[in-house]
Amino acid sequence: LMGQTWSTFMDLASLPDSLDFIGNTDGAIFARQAQVRYTYGGWQFALENPETTVTPNTGGARIVTDDNSVPDVVVKYHHADSWGSLAVAVMARQLAIESGGMDDNTNGYAVSFSGKYNVSATDDIRFTINSGEGLGRYIGLNTSNDAVLDAAGKLDAIKVTGYALAYKHAWADKWRSSLIYSAQHIDNDAQLTGLAVTDNTSSYAVNLIY
């Protein structure tokens, strides 16, 4: 595959049955971008768009850079069976900035474990757990940036952990509901980011779909 599509690091099967396409916004991996991907059975190997989002030292408007010299590298294994599916993915990234006299890069990494378990022919449980340093723009609609600048203009990767759980139940042939919970925890260094940043987000949702 060559082109723009959902990130290989993302597991579409684990997204909840929701009126909102994402549904589990806080903890979900959600990115659509240019990439080159090779698939062999359940394995996927991808080189993806390496854009970096940065928090200025002590806070301020987000800086978006495309100064990376290497793409984001993703390796994923996905297994599907009659009982549901599981996916495990790892990602390695270069975070970089070259602007206003600043020229620095650092490494980022992330892991993801997600899946869907069929409780019955109509009911299922869906989950995702994602964690890493420099994961920011991939998770929770970029609630946290990938990195923050220190006083010397050097990048410091920000650690983020997100998770979500959803249960779908069918009441009748045309009626179904989902109970959804998701959360994200951001390990900000307040001495670098300032205090006007988000440390945690969470959400609950219940729906009835006809």
Regions found by a protein language model. Give the residues of each.
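Outer membrane beta-barrel
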Residues: 1-56, 67-85, 116-119, 124-131
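Membrane-embedded beta-strands of outer-membrane beta-barrel proteins
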Residues: 36, 75, 111-113, 165, ...
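Active-site-proximal beta-alpha loop/turn segments in soluble metabolic enzymes
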Residues: 51-62, 94-100
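Short, surface-exposed, charged loop/turn segments at secondary-structure junctions
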Residues: 58-63, 142-146
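Glycine- and other small-residue-rich loops at beta-strand/loop junctions that grip anionic moieties
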Residues: 62, 66, 156
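Detector for outer-membrane/organellar transmembrane beta-barrel domains
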Residues: 80-201
